[in-house]
Amino acid sequence: MKRNIDAGLLIFRLTLGILMLMHGIHKLINGVDGIKGMLAEVGLPRFLAYGVHLCETIAALLLIVGFRTRLAAVAYTGVMVVAFLMAHIDPLFALGKSGAWLHEGIALFLFGGLGLIFTGGGKYALSKNNQWD
């Protein structure tokens, strides 16, 4: 079977982008009060919740279409690092009832975004000729 890295990157971008966009749509429908509360609990300004929402929406859309993929992935990964540190750090190596790592969802988002920072969007991206692609 022939390898197609660009098709793999397209599937990867679509997966991360669509899954994150669902979080953004949820906040669009239900508001950002939950995130505001979480931010306030750890001493961060509540207005950052709007930045989280923008990232979950705008960066996700940019990943989906492949426009400035690496730049979108930087924002995406930054939000995931903060989310991991805020809500998912303790206990770090805990397993859930099914045997899965409790933090595997956020880790997939975080490391997926990190991977796209290094690879870019690939041949099937909307933009490909900029350092942020």
Kindly give the residue locations of the regions a language model identified:
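Extended, low-polarity transmembrane helix blocks
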Residues: 1-29, 47-54, 58-133
